[in-house]
Amino acid sequence: MEEDSPATVCVTGAAGFIGSWLVMRLLERGYVVHATVRDPGDLKKVKHLLELPKAQTNLKLWKADLTQEGSFDEAIQGCHGVFHLATPMDFESKDPENEIIKPTIEGVLSIIRSCVKAKTVKKLVFTSSAGTVNGQEKQLHVYDESHWSDLDFIYSKKMTAWMYFVSKTLAEKAAWDATKGNNISFISIIPTLVVGPFITSTFPPSLVTALSLITGNEAHYSIIKQGQYVHLDDLCECHIYLYENPKAKGRYICSSHDATIHQLAKIIKDKWPEYYIPTKFPGIDEELPIVSFSSKKLIDTGFEFKYNLEDMFKGAIDTCREKGLLPYSTIKNHINGNHVNGVHHYIKNNDDDHEKGLLCCSKEGQ
């Protein structure tokens, strides 16, 4: 940590997949962390935070809600930096405009107002999404920070997770406008699909997509058809690195590996032969070009990625197995002609929340 780095920061969405790992890394570095969650009294959802090393002395939980103006004021007061990760996620929402899109936009604007009111916040780091960049009819070979998704195209297609892509795009653009003219440095980090080990108790929404070849969740194949990936730990290290870098500004793509669905299927099939992995995908071409997200801007600052694609999936699969979120094999279920139902049945019998997470991405923030 730099000598003049702030000691106190706020992390929104701290109980989630990315947020909890970021809190862990911040505590390790000696930061005092104000972590916002929906309900600090719900031990089932915050126990993993309270059990972190240094949590007793350096972690405080705050109740906050993106839909309630001013609910982040108290948590942000006295902080020098804010990491905004909280976001509504429910890919099966019946009212995405009011349940996903509006709360995401209004939430980031409310947090910016809380930062201004605090008068202590110097930097706001916003966790954006690859969906703000490549939501376009014709995929480019390489994307960088200058690209933005075509919302008209997304609205017309309404592909899996479309409301998440729209909400993140509009929220990031609104944040850039709202932070002009104040003394708060605003940075957005654009992760691709986040994969790796985790400390939350339920199936992370990101892994619903990443492990869809194992679970047979075909609705998510379109997302990994020409996929880009980053390890959870690399992403959290990137957040802290850019926060501590006084020269950091603008948007930063954080992505270390690219793979088509065919390449990913081969990697998983070779490394974990106990899982049935499809090799043919109706409607998806056999020969697919790689679509890459360039992290050149980030790497040019001196940041280094530590993990490869196999590391990401090993961490994710091992953790899911340890927590009872994935069976150790699906070959038997496939032989019996019941691959997908077998996996879903296994998860449901272990925890109803896990089933909810696998099938529709739980409403918890990332």
Curated annotation (Swiss-Prot):
- Recorded family membership: Belongs to the NAD(P)-dependent epimerase/dehydratase family. Dihydroflavonol-4-reductase subfamily.
Catalytic activity as recorded in UniProt: a (2R,3S,4S)-leucoanthocyanidin + NADP(+) = a (2R,3R)-dihydroflavonol + NADPH + H(+); (2S)-flavan-4-ol + NADP(+) = (2S)-flavanone + NADPH + H(+)
Pathway annotation: Pigment biosynthesis; anthocyanin biosynthesis
Q: What does this protein do?
A: Bifunctional enzyme involved in flavonoid metabolism.
Q: Does the keyword NADP apply?
A: yes
CDD domains listed in its UniProt record:
FR_SDR_e
**What is the designated name of this protein?**
Dihydroflavonol 4-reductase
What Gene3D superfamilies does this protein's entry cite? NAD(P)-binding Rossmann-like Domain
Q: Does the keyword Transport apply?
A: no
EC number assigned by the record: 1.1.1.219, 1.1.1.234
What enzyme category does the UniProt record give?
oxidoreductase
**Binding-site positions, NADP(+):** K45, Y164
Q: Which gene encodes it?
A: DFR
One annotated GO molecular function is: flavanone 4-reductase activity
Give the highest taxon in the source lineage.
Eukaryota
Example GO BP? anthocyanin-containing compound biosynthetic process
Q: Which UniProt keywords apply?
A: Flavonoid biosynthesis, NADP, Oxidoreductase
Specify the species: Gerbera hybrida (Daisy)
